[in-house]
Structure formats: C-alpha cells, structure tokens
Amino acid sequence: MGAGNQQERLSGEESKRWFLAGLIEGEGSVCISIKTHGTARFGYYVDPEFFIYQHRTRRSVLELAQEVFQTGWIKPKHGNPDVLVYGITSRRTITEKIIPFLKRYMTYSARSADFERFARAVELFEAKAHQTAEGMVQIVRLAYQMNHDGKQRKRPLEEVLDRILRGHTPDTPGPQG
C-alpha cells in the first residue's frame, strides 16, 4: 500500500462517508424553512431542514444516505415524481447527526459559508433563541443569508421581520374610531 493509492487506507464506512460528502456538495441542501402559521408565536414556523435530491433511478444513493445517518425518509419531490428526495427535518437528528457530519466531511466545501450559517441557526434553536423575538430575528436573518442570499424566498426579509417584531398582531386593520 504505497502513497500512490491512498484511497486504499479508507475503511468501507469511511469511503461511504466521503462519497456522501461529495454527493451533498452537489445535490444536497440545508435550509431554514419559514412557513406562515396563524397560531405560531411570531406568525411563522421556522425549522432547519436537510435534503438530498436524485433521479428516481439513483434511489440506491439516497438509501446510502439513509444507511449512514440511520434515519430520514425518501419520497418523490413535490411536482416532479422523477426526482426523489432524501430528507431529515428532525431538529434533534440534524443537531446530533447532520451538523457533526458537515463539520467533519465538508471542510473544503464551496458552500461552507451556508453550512456554517445553518449550524449557527441550529445552535440558536438548541439555545431556545427562537422563543424570543430577538432570537427569531437572528435565525431568520441567517436563513436569508443562506442559499444565494434568500433569493428564492416567497416573502421579502423585511416583511418577515416586521411580522415577528410587531409580536404577530393580526394582519387585518383594527376597528375604525
């Protein structure tokens, strides 16, 4: 086993993990979803999410992710049944499995800034920062800085922040006096 073939030194499990890291780099997504909800404290459900996308003929690759992380679901992508999605939306699993994986195996990622913001947002969730308006604002700002500065978000950042900061009062005008 010479220096010419260093891959021989990786165990089978370690090889799977490095392969999975490359897959996540190209086909993976970390995000903080922000969904309007009338009964949520600040008007939104805000949650970390992790996904990997593959054509349905490559399901085995998603099953590898399921094997490595020992959790997650696989289902067709909404609106495109030829694409399958492997997903983890459990905050605990993201904290215990995904973040440590990203820190260990995604060290040279072109998307490392997004991964760092994602990890920071998850840390804020773990510290229960999302239970205060100030903490929720921090998390939402991180979310909008991720993935090309939130360009594909449904709502502008200021609209979301305004709703959080006003304490989620109803969107309807009050009685006229």
Each predicted region: which residue ranges?
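Sequence-level preference for short, compositionally simple segments enriched
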Residues: M1-G177
